[in-house]
């Protein structure tokens, strides 16, 4: 929207063309999203409290979580509002990648919103049934993956890049790409959802990973950089640089209120959509495996649940004291802030490892 205005004004005064630069628009997108989050955060929290939209705390969970009773939830609405408004202001409306991200945000936030609503309505930690949630996520992922395939065929051949091994590129058929995209989207969406159990834990991981994906998007959308770094050049993909910046800004605005002790939780409306957004960005820039590496905390949280359930069904015993993984450490009497910061550190290290692949490329 603002881009059209800039182009119009530039016809009369070329000095305004600086606002058309990708880096400037990205900075403004991040600051705008952050400003919206900070300005509306307190108002939004009070409104949620007035409407009694509070997090339902599991009675079988860590006893330390009982003090969180009454904390407002569905803060993901604030994150997504700041995010979408920001990219609509500073993004290029003619860029198809912008609309893919917006549609992804809306679809998965709708699933999460429904889940949160049912939990609050029935005052239970159970919202949508597992089968319905999985079905809606699956259908959404297939639709989005198909859309990406149709777009990708016009730009580059579907392929799977192997980080740190620039001479290994696996060509993918349309069916292969569809299956890969499906699992990345559904897996990432649920992984962030499982990780969102401690104050600020999931959102900081989203911020760090978004920063790394922004760098990859910037390089992949620049012919000279992508050629020098032996990365696939994808026309127009650098618009994701602005989208990642807006995601960082909106997430920071939310973290301001979600940091320990949290004044608000993002709920499924936030976690399911944020996970899907990260997945779609990674798919678009051909960095699916890097998302798996950089999102190692998300992966560990998910695997802990899968292993716990599978092992218990086979042997009627538990490997972990409680899952997801962060609850296991809570059961060991490690304080919540310490667990959170340690998980942040792990994510930071994994993100740096992911960024190191650029140089190795």
UniProtKB/Swiss-Prot annotation:
Classification of source organism: Bacteria, Pseudomonadati, Pseudomonadota, Gammaproteobacteria, Candidatus Pseudothioglobaceae
Function: Catalyzes the initial step of the lipid cycle reactions in the biosynthesis of the cell wall peptidoglycan: transfers peptidoglycan precursor phospho-MurNAc-pentapeptide from UDP-MurNAc-pentapeptide onto the lipid carrier undecaprenyl phosphate, yielding undecaprenyl-pyrophosphoryl-MurNAc-pentapeptide, known as lipid I.
A molecular-function term among this protein's GO annotations: phospho-N-acetylmuramoyl-pentapeptide-transferase activity
TM spans (from-to): 21-41, 69-89, 93-113, 131-151, 168-188, 200-220, 240-260, 264-284, 289-309, 338-358
Catalytic activity: UDP-N-acetyl-alpha-D-muramoyl-L-alanyl-gamma-D-glutamyl-meso-2,6-diaminopimeloyl-D-alanyl-D-alanine + di-trans,octa-cis-undecaprenyl phosphate = di-trans,octa-cis-undecaprenyl diphospho-N-acetyl-alpha-D-muramoyl-L-alanyl-D-glutamyl-meso-2,6-diaminopimeloyl-D-alanyl-D-alanine + UMP
Enzyme category, top tier: transferase
GO cellular component: plasma membrane
Cofactor: Mg(2+)
Pfam families: Glycos_transf_4, MraY_sig1
InterPro entries: Glycosyl_transferase_4 (IPR000715), PNAcMuramoyl-5peptid_Trfase (IPR003524), PNAcMuramoyl-5peptid_Trfase_CS (IPR018480)
HAMAP family per UniProt: MraY
Associated pathway: Cell wall biogenesis; peptidoglycan biosynthesis
Subcellular localization: Cell inner membrane
Major localization listed first in the record, in broad terms: membrane
Name of protein: Phospho-N-acetylmuramoyl-pentapeptide-transferase
Known EC number: 2.7.8.13
Biological process annotations from GO: cell division; cell wall organization; peptidoglycan biosynthetic process; regulation of cell shape
Keywords: Cell cycle, Cell division, Cell inner membrane, Cell membrane, Cell shape, Cell wall biogenesis/degradation, Magnesium, Membrane, Metal-binding, Peptidoglycan synthesis, Transferase, Transmembrane, Transmembrane helix
Family: Belongs to the glycosyltransferase 4 family. MraY subfamily.
Membrane topology according to the record: Multi-pass membrane protein
PROSITE patterns: MRAY_1, MRAY_2
Highest taxon above the source species: Bacteria
């Amino acid at each position: 929207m603002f881009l059209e205005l800039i182009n119009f004004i530039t016809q009369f005064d070329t000095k305004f063309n600086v606002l058309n630069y990708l880096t400037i628009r990205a900075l403004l997108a991040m600051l705008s999203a952050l400003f919206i989050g900070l300005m509306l955060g307190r108002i939004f929290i009070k409104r949620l409290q007035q409407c009694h939209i509070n997090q339902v705390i599991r009675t079988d969970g860590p006893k330390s979580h009982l003090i969180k009773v009454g904390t407002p939830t569905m803060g993901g609405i604030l994150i997504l509002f700041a995010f979408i408004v920001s990219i609509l202001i500073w993004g290029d409306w003619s860029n198809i990648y912008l609309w893919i991200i917006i549609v992804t945000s809306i679809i998965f936030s709708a699933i999460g919103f429904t889940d949160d609503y049912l939990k609050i309505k029935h005052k239970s930690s159970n919202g949508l049934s597992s089968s319905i949630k999985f079905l809606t996520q699956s259908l959404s992922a297939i639709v989005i993956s198909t859309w990406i395939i149709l777009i990708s065929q016009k730009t580059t051949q579907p392929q799977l890049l192997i980080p740190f091994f620039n001479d290994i590129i696996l060509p993918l058929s349309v069916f292969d790409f569809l299956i890969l995209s499906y699992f990345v989207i559904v897996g990432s969406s649920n992984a962030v959802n499982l990780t969102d159990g401690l104050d600020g834990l999931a959102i900081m991981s989203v911020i760090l990973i978004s920063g790394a994906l922004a760098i990859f998007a910037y390089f992949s959308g620049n012919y000279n950089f992508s050629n020098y770094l032996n990365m696939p050049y994808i026309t127009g993909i650098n618009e994701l640089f602005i989208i990642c910046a807006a995601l960082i800004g909106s997430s920071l605005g939310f973290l301001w209120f979600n940091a320990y002790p949290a004044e608000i939780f993002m709920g499924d409306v936030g976690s399911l959509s944020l996970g899907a957004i990260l997945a779609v960005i990674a798919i678009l820039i051909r960095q699916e495996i890097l998302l798996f590496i950089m999102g190692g905390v998300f992966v560990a949280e998910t695997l802990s649940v899968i292993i716990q359930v599978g092992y218990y069904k086979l042997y009627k015993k538990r490997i972990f004291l409680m899952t997801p993984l962060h609850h296991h450490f809570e059961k060991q009497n490690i304080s919540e802030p310490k667990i959170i910061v340690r998980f942040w550190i792990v994510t930071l290290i994994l993100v740096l490892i992911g960024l190191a692949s650029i140089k190795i490329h």
